[in-house]
Amino acid sequence: MIQFLVAAPCSGSGKTTLTCALLAALKRRGQDPCSFKSGPDYIDPMFHRAVLGVESHNLDLFFSAPETVRVLYAQAAAGHGAAVCEGAMGFYDGLGGVSDTASAWHLADTLGLPVLLVVQPRGASLTLAAQINGLKQFRTPSHLAGILLNDCAPHLYALLAPMLERETGLPVLGYLCLLYTSPSPRDGATS
């Protein structure tokens, strides 16, 4: 079974967008994916449900013991070709923001899942490698297995992917393009 957790250095990096894109791709390929969300969040699972047409499951290491979370995960994933978990907030951000307890990393560690790290290359290039290396070294094992770039232009991906692979030792698995939108009146645009 294909299984992994999608995480990011911080909120607003595009975890939900990439999780839904990966779920849709797995569904199109006949993998019958199931989805999970770290913590008690009910909003992101609604997006998962919209993509899959099935329930998304919450896995919360604050409200449940690790063994309970492992059992809930195994039961919900049984019979599926893929299981995709979406982390919350930053990768190591757990209880109160000052602990890794109940963080995305804690969930990956509890379930033994590889982690795909979503990174937005906004206003940074080589510094991204330093940040990723910091995430790799902060806890052992980090479970980081690959990088996905979000809001990335194709020419920037061609430049960043080889550098990030060389500097971090992690494969860069792909990217989602920056989606340009028309300015709205709320953005100060006038007609």
Please tell me what each predicted stretch does.
Residues 169-179:
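Beta-strand-loop-alpha "switch" segments that mediate conformational coupling across diverse proteins
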Residues 115-118, 173-175:
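Short hydrophobic alpha-helical runs that function as membrane-insertion/retention elements
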Residues 180-185, 189:
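Conserved small/polar residues in nucleotide/adenosyl-binding loops
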Residues 2-17, 23-111, 119-143, 151-159:
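ATP-dependent carboxylate-amine ligase catalytic core
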Residues 163:
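Conserved anion/nucleotide-ligand pocket segment
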